[in-house]
Amino acid sequence: MTGTVTLNPCIDRTCCIDGFTVGGMNRIISDRRDISGKGINVSLALKELGEPVLTSGFLYSGSRSVFLEGLKNNFLDYRAVEVDGYLRENIKLWDKRSDITTEVNQKGAFVPEDKVEAFISLFSSFVGTLDTVVLSGSVPEGVRRDIYRVLIERANEKGVKCILDGEGDLLLSGLEARPFLIKPNEYEFISAFAPKDGSLEEIAKRAKEIVRSGMTTMVSVTLGRRGALLTDGKDTYFASPPEMEVKCTQGAGDSVVAGISLAMAEGKGMADMLRYGVAAASGTLMREGTEMCRKEDFMRILPQVKVKSL
C-alpha cells in the first residue's frame, strides 16, 4: 500500500478565463472547487488507478464537514490530527488561450507545536504498514521546516520507501534523511540545485550528480510540456507526452508522482515508472479543475508515451 502526507490541505477554486488581462475585466467561463493539497491529489490519482492508498495530514476544525465530505465522496481513508482553524482556499486562474495558470494561494492556519508532534506520532504508528509513502507540498505556519526529514527518518526505520516532492528548504532538509526518490519540478530543481542552464542535458547531468552523491536513490524532474526525466545515477530516461487538448494544468505533477508510485507497487523498472508518471499526468491535463486522471484515459495514453534513454 502507498501512503501520502498532506500537511497543508486546501480547497482549490479553479477559474477558467479565455484571455487573461492584467488590470482589466476578466470573465469566468467555468468555475469549480475541489479538495486538494499535493498529497491528496496523489491519493486521488492512485485511487482512480486502482492502487490502495492511505491519506494523512491535518484536519481543520472550522472546515471539518466540507473536508470530510470531500474525502468521503472520493472514498479516501484519512488519518489526521485535528487542529483549530479553516482550510485555506487557493485560487487558480487558468487562461485557456495562453495555457498559463496564475495562482493565488493562502498560507494556511497556524499549527501549534504539540499538534505537529502529535502528527509525527500518528505517522510513526501507521507508516510501517506501507510499502511507499509520498511526502509532498508546503507546510503551514508553526510546522517545523525539517518536518520531512523527521518523517523520512521514521519511514526509513521501518524500511518504507519515501518519495519527496517539496521545494526550497523543505526539499533540502528532507534530502538529509536520504529519501528513495525526489520529484521537483523544473523551477524547484533549478532553484535548489543550480544546473548550468535549463537544458535537458544539464538538468539530467545535475540530477545524476545528486544521486551519485548518495542523497537519494532516484531523481525525477518534471519539465512541463517537454515531459519528465528519471535517473538512478547510472541510467537516465526521458519521456514526452502525446499531443492533447489541455483543459487544466493543476495536479499534473502530483499525477506523475502517483504514476511512479503505482509502477513501483507493480514492480516495474525505471522506464515504465516514468511512462506511468507521464501517462497519469497527461490524463490529468485532460480534466477540468483539480480533477485527477481517469483510469481509462491512463490506459489509453500509456502506450502513446515515448520514453528514450539519455
Regions found by a protein language model. Give the residues of each.
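Gly/Ala-rich phosphate-binding loop of Rossmann-like dinucleotide-binding domains
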Residues: 47, 156, 265
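Hydrophobic alpha-helical segments and helix pairs
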Residues: 112-150, 155
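Glycine-rich phosphate/adenosyl-contacting loop at the front of the ribokinase-like
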Residues: 1-56, 64-66
